[in-house]
């Protein structure tokens, strides 16, 4: 039953990604922007990641206790899930995946770093292109169609942010994206 479940979840994710990309590109997706606490967003996303997450060490580091950003939380949770699921899929069992966030001027920078084998410079140039799949040397009969990171880019762009990938030192990958900062004002409490 495990493989049936895994295959059905793959189809559900594929369908959701295709629908989201289509809605974003044709302008029919309307963002429902609200101020959200980053810690809550991380917690929600981690609760929905791949069942193989237990084979990895996932941690959260926050620079500020009350860090908030303006977002459509449903879509940003989907971005985080896609990136974390990729980290789970393409890193060996026991790898560390760290989610972190910090304030940068009028934005919040969210980072998802892993200590896996990393991503080639050639692959980094195309990771966010629709239908691009990197040759990562890992056999997987359920290889993706190259939609997940393209969708992530479309969602982050729609929020007025930027998404990028870089090397993690000494090895691994870091995906980071920005969202508009929501200032917390205690004067009106």
Question: What residue ranges belong to the model's regions?
Answer:
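Short conserved segment of the HATPase_c
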Residues: 119-131
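Short alpha-helical Gxxx[C/S/T] motif in the catalytic ATP-binding
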Residues: 148, 152
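Conserved catalytic submotifs in the C-terminal HATPase_c
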Residues: 32-37, 57-67
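Short helix-loop "hinge" at the ATP-lid/N-box region of the Bergerat-fold HATPase_c
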Residues: 87-88
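Short alpha-helical segment of the dimerization/phosphotransfer core of two-component systems
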Residues: 6-11
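Conserved micro-motifs of the catalytic ATP-binding
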Residues: 26-31, 68-71
């Amino acid at each position: 039953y495990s493989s049936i479940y895994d295959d059905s979840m793959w189809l559900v994710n594929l369908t959701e990604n295709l629908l989201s990309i289509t809605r974003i590109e044709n302008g029919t997706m309307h963002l429902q922007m609200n101020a959200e606490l980053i810690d809550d967003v991380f917690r929600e996303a981690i609760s929905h990641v791949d069942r193989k997450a237990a084979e990895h060490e996932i941690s959260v580091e926050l620079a500020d206790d009350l860090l908030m950003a303006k977002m459509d939380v449903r879509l940003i949770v989907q971005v985080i899930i896609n990136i974390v699921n990729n980290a789970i899929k393409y890193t060996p069992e026991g790898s560390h995946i760290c989610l972190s966030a910090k304030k940068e001027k009028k934005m919040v920078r969210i980072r998802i770093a892993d200590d896996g084998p990393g991503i080639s410079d050639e692959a980094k140039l195309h990771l966010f292109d629709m239908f691009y799949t990197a040759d990562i040397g890992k056999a997987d009969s359920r290889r993706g169609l190259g939609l997940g990171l393209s969708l992530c880019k479309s969602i982050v762009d729609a929020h007025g942010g930027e998404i990028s990938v870089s090397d993690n030192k000494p090895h691994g990958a870091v995906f980071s994206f920005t969202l508009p900062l929501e200032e917390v004002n205690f004067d009106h409490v």
